[in-house]
Regions:
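N-terminal hydrophobic/helix-forming segments and targeting peptides
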Residues: 1-150
């Protein structure tokens, strides 16, 4: 029987400082820290930006011309979305690209437009299911509010 920690197929990820993690516990801790810091898509975009900054990426401003070119390693944020890229030193003509995508706004319980209601003397917050949550996972924890007021 082999010890999972001694096998070559171990987890590898990066910390906020861009350090490669080859330790399962450090990988797990980094993921837990990310999830804790990201109760909404807005928080997740901010946390990803913080980690990208620590790894040497540059935030690009969408409101100005990029005539001088994009930063080689950069990102843009709009609302609760973030797009990041890493360009090679030299890009051969006809070279392809790889795009990886994910979204952080689902599953969730989202407030309805008329969220505050009173029923039988109880002040309630009217919410709707967004995405496909495993509802049982919401039953054994305190719920909170996170996001942006508009």
């Amino acid at each position: 029987m082999t010890d999972a920690a001694s096998t070559p197929a171990r987890a590898a990820a990066t910390t906020g400082a861009g350090t490669i993690l080859h330790d399962d516990d450090a990988y797990t801790d980094s993921l837990i820290d990310f999830v804790t810091a990201s109760p909404s898509s807005y928080h997740a975009a901010t946390e990803v930006a913080r980690r990208l900054d620590a790894a040497g990426f540059t935030r690009a401003d969408e409101t100005v011309s990029w005539e001088g070119g994009l930063p080689r390693r950069g990102y843009v944020i709009r609302d609760g979305a973030i797009a990041a890229w890493a360009l090679p030193e030299a890009l051969p003509a006809g070279a392809g690209m790889r795009i990886v995508g994910a979204h952080t706004d689902s599953p969730a319980l989202k407030l309805k437009p008329s969220a505050a209601v009173v029923r039988s003397g109880w002040q309630l917050i009217n919410a709707e299911v967004y995405g496909g949550p495993l509802l049982a996972s919401f039953l054994d924890r305190e719920l909170g509010l996170a996001g942006r007021l508009t």
